[in-house]
């Protein structure tokens, strides 16, 4: 299926939700080679991702994630796409502590740096946090501390098939977009920063299709995948 999908993308044709679902299933079950995965990611980025494509991918990733239970509802996540190339500190992780301190339960989803200098897991590991804590421990953190960190590689085991191609490409791909959409705790209230202005409406459409309750999708006019302090921000 992935070969046919690559051909469609190279012809500047969108994939429907069912096809996107099938391709991600093939990737996450080890049915695609590294070359096919890399080719697919580049072709998709060149064409541009649609709501249906991202929704189909996210549905598969959510279904295959190790679930996290715990914490007082509603759960909140502050997870940006990364990939803005700005070299700023990891703002979403700092925000997670502020939000938790304000009384919200924060189920923070994140990873090590893939296309940026510093990911959420890198920051927390330097602070002495066990970023690879068991699902039970993360759930206990949500219950007792009101904040827990969910390390994407530990909870999205099927993603192992895409790690190599992503790292070798060294550039942002649809997986940057998918990270904030596949929270293992099922957080339905989110603040998501995106690396490109056109993604604000696309991501909002995907969140609606996936059943989110409340969400802000933001992009700074200076290119940040955050609300910026140097000019207007798109929300």
Regions found by a protein language model. Name each.
Residues 11, 29, 47, 79-82, ...:
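Short glycine-rich loop/turn motifs that provide flexible caps or phosphate-binding loops at active sites
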Residues 8, 14-15, 63-68, 88-89, ...:
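Glycine-rich anion-binding loops and their surrounding alpha/beta cores
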Residues 80, 84-141:
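A generic, well-ordered mixed alpha/beta core segment in the N-terminal half of proteins
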Residues 1-87, 102:
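Acidic, glycine/proline-rich low-complexity segments that act as flexible tails and inter-domain linkers
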Residues 36-37, 106-109, 217:
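Short beta-strand segments at enzyme active-site cores
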Residues 69-79, 107-113, 175-178:
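Core alpha/beta catalytic barrel or barrel-like domain that forms the active/cofactor pocket
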Residues 3, 14-21, 31-38, 48-55, ...:
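Electropositive phosphate-/nucleotide-binding environments in soluble metabolic enzymes
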């Amino acid at each position: 299926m992935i070969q046919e999908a690559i051909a469609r993308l190279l012809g500047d044709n969108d994939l429907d939700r069912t096809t996107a679902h099938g391709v991600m299933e093939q990737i996450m079950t080890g049915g695609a080679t590294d070359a096919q995965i890399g080719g697919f990611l580049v072709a998709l980025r060149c064409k541009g991702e649609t709501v249906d494509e991202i929704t189909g991918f996210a549905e598969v990733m959510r279904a295959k994630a190790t679930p996290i239970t715990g914490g007082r509802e509603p759960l909140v996540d502050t997870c940006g796409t990364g990939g803005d190339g700005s070299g700023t500190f990891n703002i979403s992780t700092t925000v997670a502590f502020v939000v938790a301190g304000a009384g919200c339960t924060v189920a923070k989803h994140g990873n090590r740096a893939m296309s940026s200098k510093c990911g959420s897991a890198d920051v927390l590991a330097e602070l002495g946090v066990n970023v690879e804590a068991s699902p039970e421990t993360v759930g206990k953190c949500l219950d007792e501390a009101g904040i827990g960190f969910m390390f994407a590689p530990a909870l999205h085991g099927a993603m192992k098939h895409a790690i190599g191609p992503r790292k070798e490409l060294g550039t942002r791909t649809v997986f940057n977009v998918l990270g904030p959409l596949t929270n293992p705790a099922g957080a339905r209230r989110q603040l998501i920063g995106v690396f490109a202005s056109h993604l604000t409406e696309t991501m909002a459409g995907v969140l609606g299709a996936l059943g989110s309750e409340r969400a802000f999708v933001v992009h700074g006019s200076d290119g940040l995948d955050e609300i910026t302090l140097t000019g207007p921000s798109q929300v």
